[in-house]
Amino acid sequence: VAGCELAMAMAFALRAAGVKPRITVIELGPEISGVSRQARHRILLAMDGLGIVIKTSARVIEVRADQLLLDGDSPVAANLCVGAAGGLAHTWIAKTDLPQRDGFIEIGADLGVVGDKALFAVGDCAVMPHALRPKAGVFAVRAAPILHYNLRAALSGNERKTWRPQKHYLKLISLGGQSAIAEKFGF
């Protein structure tokens, strides 16, 4: 959904500057992911209203100065390419001996790295296998007070607190101008 937000923001800004852009969003999956059916419908309507084309089930195989080459499809002309791939594992993590799951540092409920009481990790570099959540900034922000407490506890020898990440959170998805849709609990 981040690529859609970026496309709509750029379309809005360019139109405000008097430019009529041709924008194409290329989505690897069969549809925009990470949102409910209702939100997806509203996003697609907003993109259509801004003249943004979306190509789904499309794989970019090469980025050139003036076009994107797609696997099994015609090239897409481009003056500017912007990538938005979501939360991906950092390559440096794979080069460490830290415990990992799918390239993310494995942490426990106290935000400590599994097997090492002196290390902590939160945010997009970490994963809590017992409480899997999407990669969204809200979780790192909400973990901060527990991380702060547990860092102090680790230094003083006190007991650590457990963090329980919320299951539902508010998503605000910009539609390109001064409007957005809100989604929580799948609506």
Could you say what each language-model-derived stretch is?
Residues 3-4:
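N-terminal Rossmann-fold NAD(P) dinucleotide-binding loop
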Residues 8-58:
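Rossmann-like dinucleotide-binding cores of NAD(P)H-dependent redox enzymes
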Residues 24-26, 55, 82, 120-122, ...:
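Hydrophobic/aromatic beta-strand patches that form the interior of the parallel beta-sheet core
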Residues 28, 124, 177:
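Cofactor-binding loop segments of dinucleotide-utilizing enzymes, especially the Rossmann-like FAD-
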Residues 56-67:
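A conserved short coil-to-beta-strand element within the FAD-binding core of flavoproteins
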Residues 60, 71-74:
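A structured beta-alpha segment of the ubiquitous adenosine-cofactor-binding alpha/beta core
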Residues 67, 75-142, 149:
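FAD-site-proximal beta/loop scaffold in flavoenzymes
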Residues 146-187:
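C-terminal, flexible cofactor-proximal segment of oxidoreductases
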